[in-house]
Regions:
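Charged, compositionally biased N-terminal leader segments and the immediate start
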Residues: 1-27
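NTP-dependent nucleotidyl-transfer catalytic core
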Residues: 22-44, 52-504
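Short, surface-exposed ligand-recognition loops at beta-strand->loop->(often short) alpha-helix junctions
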Residues: 2-7, 47-53
Length: 504
């Protein structure tokens, strides 16, 4: 199926080919100050023929005929031939495309036989699914839909954060003060309380951090008690996450999590050393913990350097080395991301892997993308689609301090506000429930996607749940009204009519 613009370009080539070789015909979009639809520069052809381009355009203007074409006007200006569509013929052709393709209008085969992996959402097990996670989830899901529409085989991968030092902290605190029955009744909120409590106690007694690291090391070594706790944390967390994904109508092609790649970590570290990229060096404790996703201020007296495996990138304009292994052999974020990327390449052979992750990690992605290139993985393109943070009026959300807004609370509030808007409608209870979910959650999605992607957002309940003006519900209402008008007309719409005859 060819769209009208493609057909129009072919028709323009046919019009000009008696006078200009096809290889010399270049079709451009004209600049904004030129009121035309296509512009054809003649400088290159004129130079070959040793002609003045202005004179050449004037000469062609006399020869080119537009009868029985989709074009209504031709203009010679500054070495360009500018062509304008016949508005009636063009509109009729567009609407014929609509009728022929219906909901597939706008799709293409650009991605035929090509695979793209999109890594998005990726919440952490045992932590709340906050409004901050909405951005990655909704942007990533939109990208999946767009690339699928373009003909790509899309693998939407929810790379769950189910590994890392935070699990050691939770295990320690659960054994110290947790209650399984209480947690089973309200998993995420109760696990959050344990996480916050651990950090509150660690401020008073920093040695607790070592207990957390020791528990995680037990997990990495396959300790039965640690493994059983980790499986339980993962199962109850995913059950909570799935309920939110169902509300958002977001589905994934793959949900493996960081832990899936544990048996591949040593291979990627060995490969980095074998290829002469990795060396042993020193890093401050803060730098090591930052590389494991932990941000913590230490006293100066604590800042004794640790031995780590790292990859220096100074020769490539990146002054911060990428840390890939702790001195005790424990893995870091980068270790797991490198192993994951290699596995995705081997299993999927994607042309591109896209990571939908916040802008605060731009440096980190530059680091390990460069490492993948240096290790020889050049056939796959790596892209970081980053976005601004969602902040609270009092500052950045902080899980360890319990300063978060649960996404489920936002979605439920949106549904309730939508119910109020439609309570006087002549609908039964089931219809009201269904419509309020569609409208409420649509409002939240639209409010996020309509923002400037790269700017930080200060969370505002009224803006997030807007039901009027420039909002999701407004667009949904407009669509419903148009469908109603078409149904009530009782006529088949014939787009061969003289549409666009009003030209004033």
């Amino acid at each position: 199926m060819q769209y009208i613009l493609e057909k129009a370009k072919l028709e323009l080539i046919k019009i000009l080919s008696p006078y200009i070789p096809e290889s010399d015909i270049e079709i451009r979009n004209p600049p904004e100050n030129i009121k035309a639809d296509f512009a054809v520069p003649l400088f290159g052809f004129a130079k070959k023929q040793k002609l003045n381009p202005i004179n050449l355009t004037e000469e062609l203007l006399k020869k080119v005929k537009l009868e029985d074409t989709i074009f209504s006007q031709i203009e010679a200006k500054g070495g360009f031939l500018n062509f304008t569509f016949n508005p009636v013929k063009f509109s009729q052709a567009v609407f014929r495309n609509f009728q022929e393709l219906e909901e597939k209008y706008g799709s293409s085969e650009e991605g035929k036989a090509k695979t793209i992996v999109i890594d998005y959402s990726s919440p952490n097990i045992a932590k709340p699914f906050s409004v901050g996670h909405l951005r990655s989830t909704i942007i990533g899901h939109a990208l999946c839909n767009i690339f699928s529409f373009m003909g790509y085989t899309v693998i939407g991968d929810n790379h769950i954060g189910d590994w890392g030092t935070q699990f050691g902290k939770l295990m320690f605190e659960f054994n110290n003060s947790g209650d399984k029955n209480v947690i089973d009744a309200n998993p995420i909120e109760e696990l959050l309380k344990l996480y916050v409590k651990f950090h509150e106690e660690a401020k008073k007694n920093p040695s607790l951090e070592e207990h957390g690291r020791a528990w995680f090391k037990k997990l990495e070594n396959g300790d039965p008690e640690a493994t059983e706790l980790w499986k339980w944390f993962s199962q109850i967390s995913w059950k909570e996450f799935q309920r939110i994904y169902d509300m958002l109508d977001v589905k994934f092609d793959e949900v493996l999590g960081e832990s899936f790649y544990n048996d591949k970590l040593q291979d990627i570290i060995k490969e980095a050393f074998d290829k002469g990229l990795a060396t042993w060096g020193e890093a401050l404790p803060d730098e090591v913990e930052s590389a494991d996703g932990i941000t913590k201020q230490r006293e100066q007296s604590e800042s004794k350097k640790e031995i780590v495996a790292l990859i220096r990138l100074d020769d490539y304009g990146i002054s911060t080395p990428l840390l890939i292994q702790k001195s005790d052999g424990a893995s870091l974020y980068a270790t797991r991301d490198l192993a994951t990327a290699k596995d995705r390449i081997n299993r999927r052979r994607p042309v591109e892997i896209i990571y939908v992750v916040g802008g605060e990690q731009q440096l980190y992605f530059k680091q390990w993308f460069k490492v993948m290139e240096l290790m020889g993985y050049k056939e796959t393109k790596f892209s970081h689609v980053w976005f601004g943070l969602v902040r609270l009026p009092e500052g950045r959300m902080k899980t360890r301090e319990g300063r978060v807004i649960f996404l489920e609370d936002v979605l439920n509030e949106a549904i309730n506000r939508a119910k109020i808007c439609i309570q006087d409608r002549n609908l039964n209870d089931r219809e009201k429930e269904e419509i309020s979910k569609i409208v409420g959650i649509g409002a939240v999605k639209y409010a996020d996607l309509s923002q400037n992607r790269i700017k930080d957002i200060v969370f505002d309940w009224d803006k997030a749940l807007n039901m009027h003006g420039d909002s999701g519900p407004y667009l949904q209402y407009a669509y419903a009204r148009i469908q109603s008008i078409l149904r009530k007309s009782g006529q088949d719409i014939n787009f061969n009519l003289g549409v666009c005859r009003i030209q004033k």
